[in-house]
Amino acid sequence: MGQRLNLVFWIFVSILAFLNFGMASKIGICYGRNADNLPSPNRVSELIQHLNIKFVRIYDANIDVLKAFANTGIELMIGVPNADLLAFAQFQSNVDTWLSNNILPYYPSTKITSISVGLEVTEAPDNATGLVLPAMRNIHTALKKSGLDKKIKISSSHSLAILSRSFPPSSASFSKKHSAFLKPMLEFLVENESPFMIDLYPYYAYRDSTEKVPLEYALFESSSQVVDPATGLLYSNMFDAQLDAIYFALTAMSFKTVKVMVTESGWPSKGSPKETAATPENALAYNTNLIRHVIGDPGTPAKPGEEIDVYLFSLFNENRKPGIESERNWGMFYANGTNVYALDFTGENTTPVSPTNSTTGTSPSPSSSPIINGNSTVTIGGGGGGGTKKWCIASSQASVTELQTALDWACGPGNVDCSAVQPDQPCFEPDTVLSHASYAFNTYYQQSGASSIDCSFNGASVEVDKDPSYGNCLYMIAPATDGFNRTMAGNITGNITAIDSPLASPSSTNEAFRQMVVAVSVLLPCFVVCSSIW
């Protein structure tokens, strides 16, 4: 009897191991908030769910953001900013209080799975490397008290500059000046089965060495390969070469088994005059090819088939970030919700992307294209469903005072995102109250259901059947809906109108069915064997 139970037990263990082995690499998104006029966290959560993104990185533990992701199933990586490292490292009580206030009230409804302690501390001007490990240990102690030390992983993200050399990959090594910091931190990661977090940016390597690095090599578009003379390994793209450099550096320090997670990678869509490769076309090409590579062809030349999790940087352009122009233009979306370029996050679209090698950087403008994700669409600008299309605009007969009063209400209590009519935004010109009010009135009208009563504004507005959009200023239009679609009131922004229900997207349904078939095909023989045993 005991032998039979043991046999059944090990059969099921083997099955679970097999199913776990088949798990795919993961694509996540970085949700930075160093910008003005971003959509509310609730609206951002809606957008991320629609895009079917299951993994999100934030850079603090903002309560409003944590609440917005509650009960979504999205796995959240939260951050401890560099400015908080001293307090976290000095006193356990500080960390205990932080955990009690910022984590425990929202967990597990908000699925927090990891904490990144500090951001690229080796490159920070205040040199806070000595604070990272004490802070990590205090966080681990606090999590252990709450029984969460096995459920929430702790690590710290680094830039590639932590290496003293990165090419050829086999000769890569960590900088000696960081060895005193790295070795005990890596021991902590091994002890707690946490990943080594690295931010990889082939863009910077290309920008700083355009005469040596082909753009195609940085964009996953190269038809030739670079050889590592020591190993003979061939590299067709820079991302793999950078990632293998990390693997080799870890091996050189006797930490070969540490899992690596890429916590940032992306490409800017706009840059300074000298950053000619910072274009929307190249950003789309890099991120599209990165997703396809990670999902469809996992691993690197040194570690073929190795599962690797990658977080794309970033969801939004962040206009408050200091530095050169490209620093503020890594996002897939503008702050007003229009897409900088339409990225397929699934990796299933095989349409070729066309990078550009322009001699002058181009300035991306808000797109009027739908954002396609599988078979679901977010309609941008003057799209919409069937039936008579109507818009609500400001009446030319209304006084400036009446228009301004109604505009202030729409952008305030009316909950309209009016960032599109701010300076340097697509609907700022013409800079008149009549024009700005028209945009705000229509956004409120469409978000509220596009009924005549929603276009009253005390007589300061009128309904029209001609699309008032002009240039890059796109007016929302609410599409016709049926039992399978839903119109969002208080949507992502004035330019995102409606989304198919993300509750059962075709891609997720197909994947669930595929996994079920695999499970049944493996379990069924087991049941036959088990029946014969009994």
UniProtKB/Swiss-Prot annotation:
Glycans are attached at residues 127, 336, 357, 375, 485, 491, 495. InterPro entries: Glyco_hydro_17, Glyco_hydro_17_plant, Glycoside_hydrolase_SF, X8. It is a lipid-anchor; GPI-anchor. Gene3D superfamilies: 1.20.58.1040, Glycosidases. Pfam families: Glyco_hydro_17, X8. It is found in: Secreted, Cell wall; Cell membrane. Coiled coil: none annotated. Its EC number is 3.2.1.39. Residues 1-24 form the signal peptide. Disulfide bonds join 392-455. One of its GO terms (biological process) is cell wall organization. Its main location: secreted. Residues 508-534 form a propeptide. It catalyses: Hydrolysis of (1->3)-beta-D-glucosidic linkages in (1->3)-beta-D-glucans. It comes from the Eukaryota. GO terms for molecular function: glucan endo-1,3-beta-D-glucosidase activity. Keywords: Cell membrane, Cell wall, Cell wall biogenesis/degradation, Disulfide bond, Glycoprotein, Glycosidase, GPI-anchor, Hydrolase, Lipoprotein, Membrane, Plant defense, Secreted, Signal. PANTHER family: GLUCAN ENDO-1,3-BETA-GLUCOSIDASE BG1-RELATED-RELATED (PTHR32227). This is Glucan endo-1,3-beta-glucosidase 12. It comes from Arabidopsis thaliana. The lineage of its organism: Eukaryota, Viridiplantae, Streptophyta, Embryophyta, Tracheophyta.
